[in-house]
């Protein structure tokens, strides 16, 4: 069995530092373009990249865990390639990941003025442990606002609500009561609509 953690928009594998320390066989990955390589322009593109990554390494009985954009990748992977998986975990994510236009505008402005990216991130990272926050901040600036905007646009286009009932792999959905992007009382945070699904 292999447990793989997938970060959210503009993020990095460092976001999963404590989880990787806790689960010895776990692995956290950087999505392409974060910062090496070229970012994918859709959730589906990230799914195909991830499948190649998994198959190249010969992993089997994989459990995928993803936050935000990473959760969307996990859900779509479960729909497309359920035979690769032992289970999935979504954290602060959902089957539809609409992004408020204000956030997209802020990121467009941050491309012109890097200082605005710091302001954009600071509001979202208030609850992160200080020692981890600094590492994530450094990695976020390595990725840059163009990658953040790309990932948020991927999220904004993502919508698989109509297909949730097709997911047949064991599923755990986790939501935070103080998550400012994905509210726990939003129906789309549930990765399954069928009563046969594990939640």
Tell where the protein language model's regions lie, with residue ranges.
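Conserved HGGG/HGGXW glycine-rich cap/lid loop of the alpha/beta-hydrolase fold
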Residues: 1-38, 43
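Conserved alpha/beta-hydrolase catalytic His-Asp/Glu region
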Residues: 98-101, 115-166
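Conserved acidic catalytic loop of the alpha/beta-hydrolase fold
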Residues: 45-62
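Flexible "cap/lid" loop of the alpha/beta hydrolase fold
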Residues: 75, 79-80, 85-115, 154
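Short beta-strand/loop motif that positions the catalytic acidic residue
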Residues: 167, 173-175, 179
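Conserved alpha/beta-hydrolase "acid-adjacent" motif
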Residues: 180-186
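Gly/Ala-rich beta-loop-alpha elbow adjacent to hydrolase catalytic centers
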Residues: 66-70, 74
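Catalytic histidine neighborhood in serine/cysteine hydrolases
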Residues: 187-199
């Amino acid at each position: 069995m292999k447990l793989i953690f997938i970060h959210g928009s503009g993020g990095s594998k460092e976001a999963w530092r404590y989880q990787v320390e806790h689960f010895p066989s776990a692995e956290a990955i950087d999505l392409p373009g974060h910062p090496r390589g070229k970012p994918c322009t859709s959730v589906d593109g990230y799914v195909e990249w991830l499948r190649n990554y998994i198959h190249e390494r010969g992993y089997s009985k994989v459990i995928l865990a993803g936050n935000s954009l990473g959760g969307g990748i996990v859900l779509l992977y479960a729909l497309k390639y359920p035979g690769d998986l032992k289970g999935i975990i979504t954290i602060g994510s959902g089957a539809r990941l609409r992004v408020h236009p204000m956030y997209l505008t802020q990121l467009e402005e941050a491309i012109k003025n890097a200082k605005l990216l710091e302001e954009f991130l600071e509001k979202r990272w208030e609850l992160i442990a200080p020692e981890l926050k600094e590492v994530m901040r450094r990695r976020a600036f390595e990725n840059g606002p163009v990658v953040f905007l790309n990932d948020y646009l991927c999220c904004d286009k993502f919508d698989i609500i109509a297909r949730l009932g097709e997911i047949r792999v064991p599923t755990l959905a986790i939501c935070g009561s103080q998550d400012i992007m994905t509210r726990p009382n939003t129906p789309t945070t549930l990765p399954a609509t069928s009563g046969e699904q594990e939640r």
